[in-house]
Amino acid sequence: MAVKRSTRLGCNDCREINYLTFKNVKKNPEKLALNKFCSRCRKVVVHKEVKRK
């Protein structure tokens, strides 16, 4: 059975957390990095996985 955990994606430029997504921890243990639109920067930038608090 797959272990999916919710992860938050934060903008690489302004550090704002904009997206919430799910990832399979067993298949992809490394951090996610996706190109997404940041509403604060008003452009498409890399959003990386933010550490859970």
From Swiss-Prot:
Q: One Pfam family, please name it.
A: Ribosomal_L33
**Gene Ontology cellular-component terms listed:** cytoplasm; ribonucleoprotein complex; ribosome
The cross-references to InterPro entries, in alphabetical order and at most eight, read: Ribosomal_bL33, Ribosomal_bL33_CS, Ribosomal_bL33_sf, Ribosomal_zn-bd
Would the keyword Ribonucleoprotein turn up in this protein's UniProt record? Answer: yes
Q: Which GO terms describe its molecular function?
A: structural constituent of ribosome
Q: Which UniProt keywords apply?
A: Ribonucleoprotein, Ribosomal protein
**Transport as UniProt keyword:** no
Sorted alphabetically, the Gene Ontology BP terms of this entry are: translation
Entry superkingdom:
Bacteria
HAMAP family this protein is in?
Ribosomal_bL33
> What family is reported?
Belongs to the bacterial ribosomal protein bL33 family.
Write the protein's name.
Answer: Large ribosomal subunit protein bL33A
